[in-house]
Structure formats: structure tokens, C-alpha cells
Amino acid sequence: MEQESELLSLNTLARILTLYFSSEKGTKITPSALELITQYLRIYSKEAVCRAYEEKKNSIMSSSENEDIVLELEDLENGIAAQLALDFS
């Protein structure tokens, strides 16, 4: 597997998760579980960007315009996010 710089630290991820699970007393997460969640989020994010890029590339090619492909937030929101959530569930 390729080496990547850690953009989201495990401490940050743990803090984000505790915001959503703080109502349950004694809920803990192990470092190995944090690593797994980090990998899952990394794969999910890459897949979202790849799908949005391919979708945008196909729409640009069909309109026969010769322009650079630049992704916007809307490209991820329009159809990609819903289908990706279903595929990863």
C-alpha cells in the first residue's frame, strides 16, 4: 500500500467520533479501530473524487468542449454522494 501523509490525525478522528457517541457511558475505541476507520474514510474519499471526476469528464466529452476538468462541491453532491453511500453500506 502506498505511503500517504496523515492529513487527519487519529486524535482528531477520535475526538470527532466522541462527539457522536458521548451519550453512551463507557464507549471506547481502540487504536486499531481508529486505523481502520481512517483507512475506510480515505478509500471512501478517493472513490468519491474518482467517480465525480469520471462523471464530469464524460459530461465534458459529450458536450465536445475542450476544457480542463475542475471539480466543484456540486460535482460530489449531484448523484455521486447518494450512490456512493449505498455502495459502501
Swiss-Prot record:
The keyword Translocase does not apply. This is Inner kinetochore subunit mhf2. The gene is mhf2. The lineage of its organism: Eukaryota, Fungi, Dikarya, Ascomycota, Taphrinomycotina. It comes from Schizosaccharomyces pombe (strain 972 / ATCC 24843) (Fission yeast). Keywords: Cytoplasm, DNA damage, DNA recombination, DNA repair, DNA-binding, Meiosis, Nucleus. Disulfide bonds: none annotated. The MHF histone-fold complex is a heterotetramer of 2 mhf1-mhf2 heterodimers. Component of the inner kinetochore constitutive centromere-associated network (CCAN) (also known as central kinetochore Sim4 complex in fission yeast), which is composed of at least cnl2, cnp3, cnp20, fta1, fta2, fta3, fta4, fta6, fta7, mal2, mhf1, mhf2, mis6, mis15, mis17, sim4 and wip1. The keyword Transmembrane does not apply. GO terms for molecular function: DNA binding; protein heterodimerization activity. Belongs to the CENP-X/MHF2 family. GO terms for biological process: double-strand break repair via synthesis-dependent strand annealing; kinetochore assembly; replication fork processing; resolution of meiotic recombination intermediates. Gene3D superfamilies: Histone, subunit A (1.10.20.10). Pfam families: CENP-X. It is found in: Nucleus; Cytoplasm. GO terms for cellular component: CENP-T-W-S-X complex; cytosol; FANCM-MHF complex; nucleus. Component of a FANCM-MHF complex that promotes gene conversion at blocked replication forks, probably by reversal of the stalled fork. FANCM-MHF promotes non-crossover recombination. InterPro entries: CENP-X (IPR018552), Histone-fold (IPR009072).
